[in-house]
Swiss-Prot record:
The name this protein goes by in its record: Keratin, type I cytoskeletal 20
Region (Coil 1A): 75-110
Region of interest called Tail, as start-end residue ranges on this chain: 383-429
Organism: Rattus norvegicus (Rat)
GO molecular function: structural molecule activity
Similarity comment: family membership: Belongs to the intermediate filament family.
Listed Pfam families: Filament
Protein backbone atom coordinates (compact mmCIF):
# COMPACT_ATOMS: atom_id res chain seq x y z
CA UNK A 1 0.00 0.00 0.00
CA UNK A 2 1.41 3.34 -1.08
CA UNK A 3 1.40 6.47 1.04
CA UNK A 4 2.06 10.05 0.09
CA UNK A 5 3.52 12.85 2.12
CA UNK A 6 1.80 16.20 2.05
CA UNK A 7 2.65 19.48 3.69
CA UNK A 8 0.04 22.26 3.93
CA UNK A 9 1.07 25.89 4.33
CA UNK A 10 -1.17 28.95 4.39
CA UNK A 11 -0.21 32.57 4.50
CA UNK A 12 -2.86 35.29 4.91
CA UNK A 13 -2.19 39.00 5.09
CA UNK A 14 -4.23 42.18 5.51
CA UNK A 15 -3.64 43.16 1.89
CA UNK A 16 -6.33 40.72 0.66
CA UNK A 17 -3.71 38.18 -0.38
CA UNK A 18 -5.15 35.06 -1.87
CA UNK A 19 -4.47 31.85 -0.06
CA UNK A 20 -1.40 30.05 -1.26
CA UNK A 21 -1.28 26.31 -1.12
CA UNK A 22 2.10 24.74 -1.69
CA UNK A 23 2.33 21.02 -1.88
CA UNK A 24 5.37 18.99 -2.29
CA UNK A 25 5.32 15.28 -2.13
CA UNK A 26 7.14 12.15 -2.92
CA UNK A 27 5.95 8.59 -3.05
CA UNK A 28 7.41 6.05 -0.67
CA UNK A 29 7.15 2.39 -1.10
CA UNK A 30 6.63 -0.24 1.58
CA UNK A 31 9.20 -0.33 4.31
CA UNK A 32 10.05 3.39 3.98
CA UNK A 33 9.38 6.20 6.38
CA UNK A 34 6.43 8.51 5.84
CA UNK A 35 6.29 11.97 7.31
CA UNK A 36 2.97 13.56 7.91
CA UNK A 37 2.94 17.34 8.23
CA UNK A 38 0.78 18.35 11.20
CA UNK A 39 -0.34 21.97 11.26
CA UNK A 40 -0.90 24.38 14.14
CA UNK A 41 -2.99 27.41 13.29
CA UNK A 42 -3.20 30.60 15.32
CA UNK A 43 -4.37 34.01 14.23
CA UNK A 44 -2.74 37.37 14.68
CA UNK A 45 -4.71 40.67 14.61
CA UNK A 46 -4.28 42.33 11.22
CA UNK A 47 -1.14 40.29 10.47
CA UNK A 48 -2.69 37.37 8.63
CA UNK A 49 -2.46 33.73 9.71
CA UNK A 50 0.70 31.80 10.20
CA UNK A 51 1.01 28.00 10.02
CA UNK A 52 3.55 26.08 12.08
CA UNK A 53 4.41 22.59 10.96
CA UNK A 54 5.28 19.78 13.32
CA UNK A 55 6.66 16.65 11.74
CA UNK A 56 6.34 13.16 13.17
CA UNK A 57 7.99 10.08 11.81
CA UNK A 58 6.00 6.92 11.46
CA UNK A 59 7.45 3.63 10.37
CA UNK A 60 5.53 1.35 8.20
CA UNK A 61 6.97 -1.54 6.26
CA UNK A 62 6.44 -5.01 7.39
CA UNK A 63 3.81 -3.98 9.91
CA UNK A 64 1.50 -3.12 7.06
CA UNK A 65 2.61 -5.90 4.83
CA UNK A 66 2.29 -8.42 7.62
CA UNK A 67 -1.11 -7.17 8.65
CA UNK A 68 0.20 -5.63 11.86
CA UNK A 69 -1.28 -2.63 13.70
CA UNK A 70 -1.26 0.56 11.62
CA UNK A 71 -0.28 2.72 14.52
CA UNK A 72 2.48 1.52 16.83
CA UNK A 73 3.59 3.13 20.08
CA UNK A 74 5.01 6.32 18.55
CA UNK A 75 2.25 6.37 16.02
CA UNK A 76 -0.34 6.30 18.83
CA UNK A 77 1.36 9.23 20.51
CA UNK A 78 1.35 11.07 17.19
CA UNK A 79 -2.32 10.38 16.73
CA UNK A 80 -3.03 11.55 20.27
CA UNK A 81 -1.09 14.72 19.46
CA UNK A 82 -3.16 15.03 16.32
CA UNK A 83 -6.33 14.61 18.31
CA UNK A 84 -5.20 17.24 20.80
CA UNK A 85 -4.38 19.65 18.01
CA UNK A 86 -7.65 18.86 16.32
CA UNK A 87 -9.46 19.67 19.56
CA UNK A 88 -7.48 22.90 19.82
CA UNK A 89 -8.42 23.71 16.20
CA UNK A 90 -12.07 23.12 16.95
CA UNK A 91 -11.80 25.27 20.07
CA UNK A 92 -10.11 27.95 17.98
CA UNK A 93 -12.92 27.74 15.42
CA UNK A 94 -15.55 28.08 18.13
CA UNK A 95 -13.71 31.04 19.65
CA UNK A 96 -13.48 32.66 16.22
CA UNK A 97 -17.20 32.11 15.67
CA UNK A 98 -17.91 33.66 19.06
CA UNK A 99 -15.64 36.61 18.22
CA UNK A 100 -17.43 36.97 14.90
CA UNK A 101 -20.81 36.96 16.68
CA UNK A 102 -19.55 39.56 19.14
CA UNK A 103 -18.28 41.73 16.30
CA UNK A 104 -21.61 41.43 14.49
CA UNK A 105 -23.45 42.35 17.69
CA UNK A 106 -21.13 45.34 18.20
CA UNK A 107 -21.66 46.44 14.58
CA UNK A 108 -25.41 46.11 14.99
CA UNK A 109 -25.33 48.04 18.28
CA UNK A 110 -23.15 50.73 16.72
CA UNK A 111 -25.58 51.05 13.81
CA UNK A 112 -28.48 51.28 16.26
CA UNK A 113 -26.79 54.03 18.28
CA UNK A 114 -24.98 56.00 15.55
CA UNK A 115 -27.02 55.42 12.42
CA UNK A 116 -28.57 58.58 10.86
CA UNK A 117 -32.03 57.10 11.36
CA UNK A 118 -31.50 57.20 15.12
CA UNK A 119 -30.88 60.94 15.29
CA UNK A 120 -32.88 62.55 18.03
CA UNK A 121 -36.30 63.56 16.86
CA UNK A 122 -36.83 67.25 17.53
CA UNK A 123 -40.20 67.37 15.79
CA UNK A 124 -41.96 67.48 19.16
CA UNK A 125 -40.19 70.77 19.88
CA UNK A 126 -41.12 72.30 16.51
CA UNK A 127 -44.72 72.85 17.62
CA UNK A 128 -43.54 74.60 20.81
CA UNK A 129 -41.07 76.70 18.82
CA UNK A 130 -43.79 77.58 16.32
CA UNK A 131 -46.17 78.47 19.17
CA UNK A 132 -43.52 80.65 20.84
CA UNK A 133 -42.75 82.34 17.52
CA UNK A 134 -46.46 82.99 17.02
CA UNK A 135 -46.68 84.42 20.54
CA UNK A 136 -43.67 86.67 19.87
CA UNK A 137 -45.21 87.78 16.59
CA UNK A 138 -48.57 88.43 18.29
CA UNK A 139 -46.79 90.37 21.04
CA UNK A 140 -44.98 92.45 18.42
CA UNK A 141 -48.24 93.12 16.61
CA UNK A 142 -49.96 93.99 19.92
CA UNK A 143 -47.06 96.29 20.81
CA UNK A 144 -47.32 97.99 17.42
CA UNK A 145 -51.10 98.27 17.92
CA UNK A 146 -50.60 99.86 21.35
CA UNK A 147 -48.05 102.29 19.92
CA UNK A 148 -50.50 103.09 17.14
CA UNK A 149 -53.32 103.65 19.65
CA UNK A 150 -51.07 105.94 21.70
CA UNK A 151 -50.20 107.89 18.56
CA UNK A 152 -53.89 108.05 17.64
CA UNK A 153 -54.73 109.31 21.14
CA UNK A 154 -51.99 111.93 20.90
CA UNK A 155 -53.23 113.02 17.50
CA UNK A 156 -56.84 113.10 18.74
CA UNK A 157 -55.76 115.23 21.72
CA UNK A 158 -53.86 117.51 19.36
CA UNK A 159 -56.93 117.67 17.13
CA UNK A 160 -59.15 118.61 20.08
CA UNK A 161 -56.62 121.20 21.19
CA UNK A 162 -56.55 122.70 17.70
CA UNK A 163 -60.34 122.62 17.60
CA UNK A 164 -60.44 124.35 20.99
CA UNK A 165 -58.00 126.98 19.75
CA UNK A 166 -60.11 127.42 16.61
CA UNK A 167 -63.35 127.75 18.56
CA UNK A 168 -61.71 130.17 20.95
CA UNK A 169 -60.45 132.23 18.00
CA UNK A 170 -63.94 132.18 16.49
CA UNK A 171 -65.39 133.27 19.82
CA UNK A 172 -62.90 136.14 20.05
CA UNK A 173 -63.71 137.11 16.45
CA UNK A 174 -67.47 137.04 17.10
CA UNK A 175 -67.02 139.02 20.29
CA UNK A 176 -64.97 141.58 18.37
CA UNK A 177 -67.68 141.69 15.68
CA UNK A 178 -70.33 142.13 18.38
CA UNK A 179 -68.32 144.92 19.90
CA UNK A 180 -68.03 146.55 16.47
CA UNK A 181 -71.76 146.10 15.86
CA UNK A 182 -72.53 147.50 19.32
CA UNK A 183 -70.48 150.55 18.42
CA UNK A 184 -72.41 150.87 15.17
CA UNK A 185 -75.64 150.44 17.13
CA UNK A 186 -74.52 153.11 19.56
CA UNK A 187 -73.70 155.43 16.66
CA UNK A 188 -77.08 154.76 15.11
CA UNK A 189 -78.72 155.33 18.48
CA UNK A 190 -76.89 158.64 18.76
CA UNK A 191 -77.96 159.56 15.24
CA UNK A 192 -81.53 158.62 16.14
CA UNK A 193 -81.31 160.71 19.28
CA UNK A 194 -79.93 163.61 17.28
CA UNK A 195 -82.74 163.27 14.79
CA UNK A 196 -85.30 163.10 17.57
CA UNK A 197 -83.74 166.22 19.12
CA UNK A 198 -83.88 167.93 15.76
CA UNK A 199 -87.54 166.90 15.40
CA UNK A 200 -88.28 168.24 18.85
CA UNK A 201 -86.53 171.48 18.02
CA UNK A 202 -88.45 171.69 14.78
CA UNK A 203 -91.68 171.02 16.69
CA UNK A 204 -90.73 173.76 19.12
CA UNK A 205 -89.98 176.08 16.25
CA UNK A 206 -93.31 175.13 14.70
CA UNK A 207 -95.14 175.78 17.96
CA UNK A 208 -93.31 179.07 18.34
CA UNK A 209 -94.21 180.03 14.79
CA UNK A 210 -97.82 179.04 15.43
CA UNK A 211 -97.83 181.11 18.60
CA UNK A 212 -96.31 184.07 16.86
CA UNK A 213 -98.74 183.67 14.00
CA UNK A 214 -101.64 183.54 16.45
CA UNK A 215 -100.39 186.62 18.20
CA UNK A 216 -100.00 188.44 14.92
CA UNK A 217 -103.54 187.37 13.97
CA UNK A 218 -104.87 188.64 17.26
CA UNK A 219 -103.03 191.91 16.83
CA UNK A 220 -104.39 192.29 13.37
CA UNK A 221 -107.88 191.47 14.56
CA UNK A 222 -107.69 194.07 17.28
CA UNK A 223 -106.42 196.54 14.82
CA UNK A 224 -109.24 195.73 12.46
CA UNK A 225 -111.80 195.97 15.24
CA UNK A 226 -110.79 199.50 16.16
CA UNK A 227 -110.77 200.76 12.59
CA UNK A 228 -113.75 201.92 10.49
CA UNK A 229 -114.97 199.59 7.94
CA UNK A 230 -114.24 201.13 4.62
CA UNK A 231 -115.04 199.25 1.57
CA UNK A 232 -112.26 199.61 -0.86
CA UNK A 233 -111.90 197.83 -4.03
CA UNK A 234 -108.52 196.16 -3.44
CA UNK A 235 -106.88 192.83 -3.88
CA UNK A 236 -107.73 190.21 -1.27
CA UNK A 237 -105.23 189.83 1.55
CA UNK A 238 -103.09 186.84 2.33
CA UNK A 239 -104.46 184.04 4.46
CA UNK A 240 -101.69 183.57 7.02
CA UNK A 241 -103.39 180.58 8.63
CA UNK A 242 -103.30 178.67 5.42
CA UNK A 243 -99.72 179.70 4.84
CA UNK A 244 -98.77 178.54 8.35
CA UNK A 245 -100.65 175.30 7.87
CA UNK A 246 -98.88 174.73 4.60
CA UNK A 247 -95.51 175.50 6.19
CA UNK A 248 -96.31 173.25 9.13
CA UNK A 249 -97.35 170.47 6.81
CA UNK A 250 -94.19 170.93 4.77
CA UNK A 251 -92.00 170.83 7.87
CA UNK A 252 -93.86 167.82 9.25
CA UNK A 253 -93.56 166.06 5.94
CA UNK A 254 -89.86 166.96 5.77
CA UNK A 255 -89.27 165.81 9.35
CA UNK A 256 -91.21 162.62 8.75
CA UNK A 257 -89.29 162.10 5.54
CA UNK A 258 -85.94 162.70 7.25
CA UNK A 259 -86.91 160.38 10.09
CA UNK A 260 -88.02 157.72 7.64
CA UNK A 261 -84.86 158.13 5.60
CA UNK A 262 -82.76 157.89 8.77
CA UNK A 263 -84.60 154.76 9.85
CA UNK A 264 -84.26 153.23 6.39
CA UNK A 265 -80.60 154.17 6.20
CA UNK A 266 -80.03 152.70 9.67
CA UNK A 267 -81.85 149.53 8.72
CA UNK A 268 -79.96 149.30 5.40
CA UNK A 269 -76.62 149.80 7.11
CA UNK A 270 -77.59 147.29 9.81
CA UNK A 271 -78.69 144.73 7.25
CA UNK A 272 -75.56 145.31 5.17
CA UNK A 273 -73.35 144.88 8.21
CA UNK A 274 -75.29 141.81 9.28
CA UNK A 275 -74.97 140.34 5.79
CA UNK A 276 -71.26 141.09 5.73
CA UNK A 277 -70.83 139.59 9.20
CA UNK A 278 -72.87 136.53 8.21
CA UNK A 279 -70.93 136.08 4.96
CA UNK A 280 -67.62 136.55 6.74
CA UNK A 281 -68.64 134.13 9.48
CA UNK A 282 -69.78 131.55 6.91
CA UNK A 283 -66.59 131.97 4.91
CA UNK A 284 -64.58 131.74 8.10
CA UNK A 285 -66.45 128.62 9.17
CA UNK A 286 -66.03 127.06 5.72
CA UNK A 287 -62.34 127.87 5.77
CA UNK A 288 -62.02 126.49 9.28
CA UNK A 289 -63.87 123.34 8.24
CA UNK A 290 -61.53 122.94 5.27
CA UNK A 291 -58.51 123.55 7.47
CA UNK A 292 -59.85 121.06 10.01
CA UNK A 293 -60.50 118.47 7.30
CA UNK A 294 -57.05 119.02 5.84
CA UNK A 295 -55.47 118.73 9.27
CA UNK A 296 -57.46 115.62 9.96
CA UNK A 297 -56.44 114.13 6.61
CA UNK A 298 -52.83 115.09 7.29
CA UNK A 299 -52.98 113.52 10.74
CA UNK A 300 -54.62 110.38 9.34
CA UNK A 301 -51.97 110.11 6.64
CA UNK A 302 -49.25 110.77 9.19
CA UNK A 303 -50.66 108.04 11.45
CA UNK A 304 -50.90 105.63 8.54
CA UNK A 305 -47.35 106.49 7.49
CA UNK A 306 -46.06 105.90 11.01
CA UNK A 307 -47.94 102.61 11.24
CA UNK A 308 -46.59 101.50 7.87
CA UNK A 309 -43.06 102.50 8.88
CA UNK A 310 -43.37 100.65 12.20
CA UNK A 311 -44.79 97.63 10.40
CA UNK A 312 -41.94 97.80 7.89
CA UNK A 313 -39.35 97.96 10.69
CA UNK A 314 -41.06 95.07 12.49
CA UNK A 315 -41.14 92.99 9.30
CA UNK A 316 -37.49 93.81 8.58
CA UNK A 317 -36.50 92.78 12.10
CA UNK A 318 -38.57 89.60 11.77
CA UNK A 319 -36.95 88.90 8.38
CA UNK A 320 -33.45 89.40 9.78
CA UNK A 321 -34.23 87.18 12.78
CA UNK A 322 -35.68 84.52 10.48
CA UNK A 323 -32.64 84.68 8.19
CA UNK A 324 -30.27 84.41 11.14
CA UNK A 325 -32.27 81.55 12.64
CA UNK A 326 -32.42 79.61 9.38
CA UNK A 327 -28.73 80.33 8.70
CA UNK A 328 -27.80 78.89 12.10
CA UNK A 329 -30.09 75.91 11.52
CA UNK A 330 -28.59 75.39 8.06
CA UNK A 331 -25.05 75.59 9.47
CA UNK A 332 -25.98 73.09 12.19
CA UNK A 333 -27.57 70.76 9.62
CA UNK A 334 -24.55 71.05 7.32
CA UNK A 335 -22.24 70.34 10.23
CA UNK A 336 -24.40 67.37 11.19
CA UNK A 337 -24.39 66.13 7.58
CA UNK A 338 -20.60 66.47 7.39
CA UNK A 339 -20.23 64.58 10.66
CA UNK A 340 -22.67 61.91 9.48
CA UNK A 341 -20.87 61.60 6.14
CA UNK A 342 -17.56 61.20 7.96
CA UNK A 343 -19.12 58.63 10.27
CA UNK A 344 -20.68 56.86 7.28
CA UNK A 345 -17.32 56.71 5.51
CA UNK A 346 -15.71 55.43 8.68
CA UNK A 347 -18.49 52.87 9.04
CA UNK A 348 -18.04 51.78 5.44
CA UNK A 349 -14.30 51.44 5.86
CA UNK A 350 -14.77 49.56 9.15
CA UNK A 351 -17.43 47.39 7.53
CA UNK A 352 -15.17 46.60 4.58
CA UNK A 353 -12.29 45.84 6.91
CA UNK A 354 -14.46 43.66 9.12
CA UNK A 355 -15.94 41.99 6.05
CA UNK A 356 -12.45 41.30 4.79
CA UNK A 357 -11.43 39.93 8.17
CA UNK A 358 -14.62 37.91 8.26
CA UNK A 359 -13.83 36.46 4.83
CA UNK A 360 -10.32 35.66 6.01
CA UNK A 361 -11.67 33.97 9.11
CA UNK A 362 -14.27 32.17 7.04
CA UNK A 363 -11.55 30.97 4.67
CA UNK A 364 -9.49 29.82 7.64
CA UNK A 365 -12.53 28.05 9.01
CA UNK A 366 -13.17 26.37 5.65
CA UNK A 367 -9.59 25.24 5.34
CA UNK A 368 -9.58 24.05 8.93
CA UNK A 369 -12.70 22.05 8.20
CA UNK A 370 -10.96 20.59 5.15
CA UNK A 371 -7.94 19.71 7.26
CA UNK A 372 -10.21 18.23 9.93
CA UNK A 373 -11.86 16.13 7.24
CA UNK A 374 -8.41 15.10 6.01
CA UNK A 375 -7.33 14.13 9.51
CA UNK A 376 -10.56 12.26 9.97
CA UNK A 377 -9.89 10.30 6.80
CA UNK A 378 -6.36 9.63 8.02
CA UNK A 379 -7.69 8.43 11.35
CA UNK A 380 -10.14 6.16 9.56
CA UNK A 381 -7.29 4.63 7.57
CA UNK A 382 -8.02 6.21 4.22
CA UNK A 383 -5.30 6.91 1.75
CA UNK A 384 -4.49 10.28 0.36
CA UNK A 385 -3.41 9.91 -3.16
CA UNK A 386 -2.01 12.76 -5.03
CA UNK A 387 -0.93 12.24 -8.57
CA UNK A 388 1.95 13.90 -10.26
CA UNK A 389 -0.50 15.85 -12.38
CA UNK A 390 -2.33 17.25 -9.36
CA UNK A 391 0.91 18.25 -7.67
CA UNK A 392 2.17 19.97 -10.79
CA UNK A 393 -1.18 21.71 -11.19
CA UNK A 394 -1.11 22.98 -7.60
CA UNK A 395 2.48 24.17 -7.94
CA UNK A 396 1.67 25.87 -11.22
CA UNK A 397 -1.13 27.98 -9.71
CA UNK A 398 -0.38 31.63 -9.78
CA UNK A 399 -0.36 33.39 -6.49
CA UNK A 400 -2.02 36.75 -6.89
CA UNK A 401 -1.19 39.45 -4.41
CA UNK A 402 -2.86 42.84 -4.25
CA UNK A 403 -2.10 45.86 -2.14
CA UNK A 404 -4.92 48.18 -1.12
CA UNK A 405 -3.99 51.70 0.07
CA UNK A 406 -6.74 53.65 1.83
CA UNK A 407 -6.28 57.41 2.35
CA UNK A 408 -8.67 59.33 4.64
CA UNK A 409 -8.56 63.14 4.30
CA UNK A 410 -10.49 65.09 6.94
CA UNK A 411 -10.92 68.86 7.13
CA UNK A 412 -11.12 70.02 10.75
CA UNK A 413 -12.30 73.54 11.70
CA UNK A 414 -12.32 74.56 15.38
CA UNK A 415 -11.96 70.96 16.45
CA UNK A 416 -14.93 69.82 14.33
CA UNK A 417 -14.82 67.63 11.23
CA UNK A 418 -16.17 69.71 8.35
CA UNK A 419 -15.53 67.31 5.47
CA UNK A 420 -14.02 63.87 5.03
CA UNK A 421 -12.81 62.10 1.91
CA UNK A 422 -11.69 58.48 1.54
CA UNK A 423 -9.55 57.33 -1.39
CA UNK A 424 -8.68 53.69 -2.09
CA UNK A 425 -5.91 52.56 -4.44
CA UNK A 426 -5.51 48.88 -5.29
CA UNK A 427 -2.21 47.69 -6.78
CA UNK A 428 -1.14 44.28 -8.00
CA UNK A 429 2.09 42.99 -6.48
Amino acid sequence: MDFSRRSFHRSLSSSSQGPALSTSGSLYRKGTMQRLGLHSVYGGWRHGTRISVSKTTMSYGNHLSNGGDLFGGNEKLAMQNLNDRLASYLEKVRSLEQSNSKLEAQIKQWYETNAPSTIRDYSSYYAQIKELQDQIKDAQIENARCVLQIDNAKLAAEDFRLKFETERGMRITVEADLQGLSKVYDDLTLQKTDLEIQIEELNKDLALLKKEHQEEVEVLRRQLGNNVNVEVDAAPGLNLGEIMNEMRQKYEILAQKNLQEAKEQFERQTQTLEKQVTVNIEELRGTEVQVTELRRSYQTLEIELQSQLSMKESLERTLEETKARYASQLAAIQEMLSSLEAQLMQIRSDTERQNQEYNILLDIKTRLEQEIATYRRLLEGEDIKTTEYQLNTLEAKDIKKTRKIKTVVEEVVDGKVVSSEVKEIEENI
